[in-house]
Amino acid sequence: MFYDICHLPLPQLIFCFSKIMLHFFSRYKFLGIVLLVLSSIIITIIYQIINPKEVLPVFQPAGVNTELVDSTIQHIKKYHTIADFSLINQNGKTITQENYKDKIYVADLFFTTCQTICPIMTDNMVVIQEKLKNDSEVMLLSHSVTPVIDSVAQLKKYALEKGVNDAKWNLVTGDKKQIYTLARKSYLAVKEDGNGDEYDMIHTENFILVDKKKRIRGFYDGTKEEDIVQLLKDIQILKKEN
């Protein structure tokens, strides 16, 4: 039969071959679809292995340098979040977690009369503010560690001098012990146990990246340009995650 087919005229040979192929595909159509779906799945898996999705770590007290963590929470390995707070910003407005609901934010500690690292940190916060000025998903939050000195009027003066965008960036003051507790037990951002006494100064150069679930996703040196670049990159990674 094969010999007979091979000796057919070309038009008839093409016709016969076409009929054979149509018969094959009609008979194995389901198998072809299955193979196509499986191929797509395999290709997707291989792509994800070769190009893994970037995911930022979730920092827990037990996994952070013990110098930065209050002894009462050093055992915590999961579910750590930033505690609720109620502070006053540069416009005299009460600021709580509700103002940061469904927001990614960068937090730090500072005081307006600082002449060492604070000006550098504030300048770098301004850089972040400028880079993300049209991004309503990201906000900034700076906590004064000398709230007795940093009154609302003082914070407002400082905000105007630095070009703070009130809609994006809150400079907050308030109860000193509350701020120190936040710094030590929530932000994991200080190296000494402070209790809010008059001369008890807690202050580090850390910028803390907080996600929409109030979890810490990164620590950055607020005085270093390369850390600010990394922070901006990590914010974009976090946005994709959310």
Regions found by a protein language model. Name each.
Residues Y3-I82, N242:
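N-terminal targeting signals for export/organelle localization
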Residues H80-I82, K103-I104, I202-T204:
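Short, small/polar residue-rich loop motifs at catalytic or cofactor-binding pockets
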Residues G92, A107, F111-C114, M125, ...:
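Buried hydrophobic packing residues in well-ordered domains
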Residues D108, L140-S144, N206-I208:
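Soluble periplasmic/extracytoplasmic beta-strand elements of cell-envelope proteins
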Residues T122-L182:
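Structural microenvironment flanking redox-active thiols in thiol-disulfide oxidoreductases
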Residues N195-N242:
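Thiol-/selenol-based redox modules, centered on thioredoxin-like
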